[in-house]
Amino acid sequence: MKKEIQFSLVYRDMWQSSGKYVPRKDQLAKIAPVIIDMGCFDRVETNGGAMEQVNLLYGENPNQAVRTFTKPFNEVGIKTHMLDRGLNALRMNPVPADVRQLMYKVKHAQGVDITRIFCGLNDPRNIIPSIKWAKAAGMTAQATMCITYSKVHTAEYYINLAEQLIEGGAQEICLKDMAGIGRPAMLGTIVRAIKEKHPDIIIQYHGHNGPGFAVASMLEVARAGADVLDVAMEPLSWGKVHPDVITIQAMLKDAGFLVKDINMKAYMEARSLTQSFMDDFLGYWIDPKNSIMSSLLVGCGLPGGMMGSLMADLKGMHAAINANLKKKGEKELSEDELLVELFDEVQRIWPMLGTPCLVTPFSQYVKNAALMNLYSKSMDEKPFTRMDPAMWGMVLGKSGKLPGELAPEIIQLAKDTPHRHYGQGQYGLSPRQVLP
């Protein structure tokens, strides 16, 4: 009997991996029936991540937007899912426990079936309470492992993490390969090990296309026993976003898997509608570079989901750095040259900062530190002289335990800098206490 693979259309992340904003409520109401008509999706990502935040930024009520988008899928039995930042809920900073507990009741009432709970530190303490609250609210708790590639993040590391999350009550496991740098063979090893011990646990794979591994990774995890794959569709597929459902469906069908057919007439209609939303106003926030893959991402590991904000930040800093270089009579940098320098600096400082998974909010913290280091360099200042409070909160354990070790110079800098007020966060200081 053929193994069935289901598809989830990550319509929310398609947009936020391309730019900043998501469609308005009226636009979501238009696209939902067409997504249903495509006939190939068992799940749709409707909200979470930064969706609710950006709704507020352009004056729309996110509660109404979520209800509007989930309703058509609820009526036909397509499961809806949201992205949930664990300790941070839908924010960039820690949220009180009672508010997080209430969030699951609210989101379930708004029509969301599954919550994908993740922590950029992969700290089970940030995920397991949310598993219990989500289940109590009637949602399916999908515990997430943020995938990256480092000396710390081995197959054994992830297999052990999955075991802790399943023991903590997780009903499903998501491999969130947010930068697409998980190596296909390693991902297959992880999925196979989980399935051998827990055959009834649903495994969903989420991969970004940026560095080019994602298609191979999807085939590998499917062969290892994964149940659901996250996919995108044109005009917001490929590039630094996600693989397109057409390609993945054809690949898996040829490989002997049971996959649903795609109604191509509906696909083209959804494609046209999505393009019209871009033409309306959303396209102004999509950098053309996000439609281009880059092997430079293999080394730095920055996630596809932050490429929109990264390019906006880079443009803002580009002029300031060049102004400093010009004052010193040094050669100015092109935007591409600065981008390569940024990737190199991220790769250099990431292990120094404890090797957090480069996913929201820690990808922003590490990227910001790297960008400010480049600015400091243009000012002839020492590195890490412009670290923001959020970075110190991560270093001092405010959001949980860092996966790796802090570099000695970061520990010394922490001791020399008056940031003791960050010692009392969700957990106080990390076990690698950096202050006397």
Predicted region positions:
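Conserved, mostly hydrophobic/aromatic
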Residues: M14, I117, I173, G225, ...
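Terminal or standalone catalytic/regulatory effector modules within metabolic enzymes
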Residues: W15, I36-V54, K289-P436
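Active-site beta->alpha loop and helix N-cap motifs at the rims of alpha/beta catalytic domains
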Residues: P33, R43, G48-I166, A179-R183
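Glycine-rich phosphate-binding active-site loops on the catalytic face of alpha/beta enzymes
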Residues: I117, D177, A224-P243
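Catalytic cores of alpha/beta
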Residues: H153-L165, P211-D227
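C-terminal helical cap(s) of enzyme catalytic domains, especially alpha/beta-barrels
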Residues: S237-I262, E269
